[in-house]
Every structure is written in C-alpha cells, then in structure tokens.
C-alpha cells in the first residue's frame, strides 16, 4: 500500500471531499486507512460494565476507515501543499523508496 501511517492525505471523493488529515492507522489487508477528522460516524453504545468500571450509554462520534483509493498524498513544495500520487524507485543498494509523482522528490 502506498499510503503509510503518519502521512498527510487529502480526501478526493465522498462526503469529506477536500478535507486533509493525518493517517492514524493503515490497514493494508483491507486497503483502508483511518484519517484524523475524516469519515466521522456516530456509534450508539449501550450502558454496561467495563474493566475500568461502569460505562454510560449514549452516542459516540469516532472516525471510520476510508478506502485508500479515496485519498491522495499531500507533500510540501516551496511552502505550498501539493496533492500527488505515489510512485516507487530503487536506490543504488536496491532499497525501495517512495517518490511523489508530481514533484519528483523522495518522500
């Protein structure tokens, strides 16, 4: 997967189109990422016992994973944020390096 934990990404489609956020968790097996402040959903929780004591019921707002095809990486060039695709190249030792396709710089 070309998007990693800690990357700054922008949502390119859906209800949160145009929003930017940091990737909190990447789920490569499902091709999904959890982005900070994006795809917020409301979960209804039931009151009950937890390991730390009683939990009150109610509605909790939290982020839900979004498919990796719906986000693009944001890199900074000359003080401006640029949305770009991600490519790969190999260095002299054979290590795989991520490259911003629009700027040509290593990530």
UniProtKB/Swiss-Prot annotation:
Which biological process annotations from GO are given for this protein?
translation
* Record's keyword annotation contains Cell membrane: no
Q: Does the keyword RNA-binding apply?
A: yes
Q: Kindly give the Pfam families that the UniProt entry links to this protein.
A: KOW, ribosomal_L24
Looking at the record's lineage, which domain of life comes first? Bacteria
MF (Gene Ontology): rRNA binding; structural constituent of ribosome
InterPro entries given for it? KOW, Rib_uL2_dom2, Ribosomal_uL24, Ribosomal_uL24_CS, Ribosomal_uL24_KOW, Translation_prot_SH3-like_sf
Transmembrane residue ranges: none
Q: Which GO terms describe its cellular component?
A: ribonucleoprotein complex; ribosome
Q: Which UniProt keywords apply?
A: Ribonucleoprotein, Ribosomal protein, RNA-binding, rRNA-binding
Assembly information from the UniProt record: Part of the 50S ribosomal subunit.
What family classification does the UniProt entry report for this protein?
A: Belongs to the universal ribosomal protein uL24 family.
Function (record text): One of two assembly initiator proteins, it binds directly to the 5'-end of the 23S rRNA, where it nucleates assembly of the 50S subunit.
Matching PANTHER family:
MITOCHONDRIAL RIBOSOMAL PROTEIN L24 (PTHR12903)
Protein name per its UniProtKB record:
Large ribosomal subunit protein uL24
